[in-house]
């Protein structure tokens, strides 16, 4: 009977340890995804801020050569 208790405690301990590791990896993955989304948003903002400058440059060229 004592052997079964020890085995059960071992199984429960290993299960909890595995669950803890999985939760930590999940949190890290979610954090990396969030950081990637933030990087993508900042790149998009930088790109969108260049559009007015490009339009001004094109309009200047059109007025100069047109």
Curated annotation (Swiss-Prot):
Residues 1-22 form the signal peptide. It is found in: Secreted. GO terms for cellular component: extracellular region. Residues 23-44 form a propeptide. The keyword Signal applies. Keywords: Amidation, Amphibian defense peptide, Antibiotic, Antimicrobial, Cleavage on pair of basic residues, Secreted, Signal. The keyword Signal applies. Expressed by the skin glands. GO terms for biological process: defense response to bacterium. The modification Phenylalanine amide is found at residue 65. Has antimicrobial activity. No hemolytic activity. Belongs to the frog skin active peptide (FSAP) family. Phylloseptin subfamily. This is Phylloseptin-H2. It comes from Pithecopus hypochondrialis (Orange-legged leaf frog). The gene is psn2.
